[in-house]
Amino acid sequence: MQIHINKGVFYSFKIKDRKRLESGILLVEGEDWVLISSIFSDYIVDGYMLINKKYITSIHRTEKEMFTEKVLKASDKTDIVPYIDIPHLSIDSLFKWLEDKHIVFQIDNRDENQCWIGKILDSTKKSIFLTPLTPKGEWDRALYYAFRKANVRIISFNSDYINSLMAYNKKHVEESE
């Protein structure tokens, strides 16, 4: 999808096959992906979200988005500087960066009621293999999930949910091993 959006502006994105809009402040627009500071609900900034541009069906900038942006600006939540530097935000560079940095992230595809959290175990030209992090904060090393890179709609990372599971893992799970 050819899109024209501005950095530092709050938008809502409609993703193919999903009912829920994904909202956030645009940080970077790349070749294949957009990076937003994710606004989970109301005015709560919760990590980063990468949205695959080929699955964006529409972009909303209504009175609701403009009001939300004003509230976020009033509470100094719009001056977000991404701590990541992914060249061109292309599919290849994105997944290489996630793998090289050992980033724990969430993948969302078609079904918005299902997601997978983990880190890249291995990758090929077209696929990634994810070591899953369970809802109990444990690495399931006996299992892996395979995803076609081109089919991934949304990647989220540095969210409170993921960071909480990782903190629990570090404190309780790794200590007991």
For the regions a language model picked out, list residue spans one by one:
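Short glycine-rich, low-complexity segments
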Residues: M1-L21, L35, F40-N113, T134-E177
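Short beta-strand-centered aromatic/proline hotspots
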Residues: R20-V28, W116-D122
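Short aromatic-glycine-enriched beta-strand elements
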Residues: D32-I36, S127-T131
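Intrinsic, low-complexity N-terminal interaction/targeting segments
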Residues: H102-Q106, C115-W116, L121-D122, S127-F129
